[in-house]
Design a protein with these regions (language model features):
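RNA-contacting regions in translation and RNA-metabolism proteins
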Residues: 1-167
Length: 167
């Protein structure tokens, strides 16, 4: 591993530790039981709050993950305050994001099949930035093109048909 990669890994692990400390304080204040798991995935720190009873963490997820998104931003700010650098840390609670990622991948694959069958673009429902990235990644893996359209919170992914080159 090069020194640059080792330095980046160390920095991301530090981000995870700072985030874990912040989130442990939050759990104490909210009187919630949970464990913090820290990892580095896809070039970013990844932190998850897990519990023996995942339903006990529902309040930290909120409807459609709104509270989770807010907590992620607050956690990123806590990391930035400590390190002086912007964080791209990902926070998951009780597997909510992992489950949503799988759902979005399935929805995207179904939409890709419709695009290929009809030759017409397919617009997906509005999603948050994390979910849109999941969709864009699946579309790219399948060799098609996608774009985002609209303004938050109604921003959506559009999957485009393959362009024929006239042959």
């Amino acid at each position: 591993m090069s020194d640059d990669n080792a330095d980046k890994l160390t920095r991301l692990e530090e981000e995870g530790e700072i985030a874990a400390d912040y989130l442990e304080e939050l759990l104490d204040i909210a009187d919630l039981d949970g464990d913090i798991e820290i990892d580095v995935e896809n070039g970013r720190a990844s932190v998850e709050i897990v519990a023996d009873d995942p339903d006990a963490l529902d309040r930290l997820v909120g409807d459609d993950g709104e509270v989770l998104d807010a907590l992620q931003e607050l956690t990123r700010l806590a990391v930035q305050t400590e390190t002086g650098e912007r964080s791209r840390l990902m926070l998951d609670i009780a597997g909510f994001r992992a489950e949503r990622k799988e759902e979005r991948q399935d929805i995207t694959r179904e939409a890709i099949a419709r695009v290929r069958a009809t030759g017409e673009a397919v617009k997906l429902d509005a999603m948050n930035p994390f979910e849109r990235k999941v969709c864009h990644d699946v579309v790219a893996e399948e060799g098609l093109t996608s774009e985002s359209e609209g303004a938050e919170p109604h921003r959506r992914v559009v999957i485009l048909p393959e362009e024929s080159d006239g042959e």
